[in-house]
A protein has these predicted regions:
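Active-site C-terminal subdomain of aminotransferase-like
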Residues: 2-89, 162, 170-177
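Conserved C-terminal alpha-helix-loop-beta "cap" of PLP-dependent enzymes
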Residues: 69-70, 76-176
Length: 177
């Protein structure tokens, strides 16, 4: 339900359905529940994604990797860039994200020739909804400086688990683990 002044209720109806039609006709086609669930959960999911990005930045910077933005910088979105400077670390990190995923955790992402890219790309995203990078995903082109673009984390607990597994895979064979 939406409650408040009638002019604000009308504006909300216009925003949630169809401009000019408002609450009376809007093209919801039986998806009101899903639309409202999205509005309800969005603040929590975005907060979890931001916390996951900040934690990623802090942990990877502590391990000696360059990150953008840094954990203590102002953020404009939920994407965390991790600069690995070598393809092996980029691949291992993305594979670790996939291993911690709720869907297809047994899949092993490998670099491939993706249409539209001049370099091979590795993509990790074991998501409930295909293509939903907000759940937790990590990808990057295999070219210098080998940047991983990580985003998402439906819950902060899941985001932390993903980072822990990715760092574990990243550090295999290195003395710092």
């Amino acid at each position: 339900y939406i409650a408040g002044r009638s002019d604000l209720i009308d504006l909300a109806g216009e925003r949630l359905t169809c401009p000019g039609e408002g609450r009376e006709v809007g093209p919801t086609l039986g998806i009101n529940r899903e639309l409202l669930q999205g509005l309800f959960f969005a603040p929590s999911v975005v907060a979890s994604s931001l916390k996951t990005a900040i934690l990623t930045s802090k942990v990877l910077e502590h391990l000696g990797y360059q990150v953008e933005p840094r954990y203590d910088e102002v953020r404009a979105d939920i994407v965390q860039n991790i600069i690995f400077n070598n393809k092996e670390d980029l691949i291992k990190y993305c594979q670790g994200i996939q291993m911690a995923s709720p869907i297809d955790s047994n899949a092993i992402p490998v670099p491939w020739d993706m249409p539209g890219y001049t370099d091979q790309v590795i993509m990790a995203a074991g998501c409930f909804t295909q293509g939903s990078s907000i759940e937790l995903s990590c990808d990057g082109p295999l070219r210098s400086p080998y940047i991983a673009y990580q985003q998402g984390g439906l819950t902060y607990s899941y985001g932390k688990l993903g980072i822990m597994k990715a760092v574990t895979e990243l550090m295999k064979g290195k003395n710092e683990l």
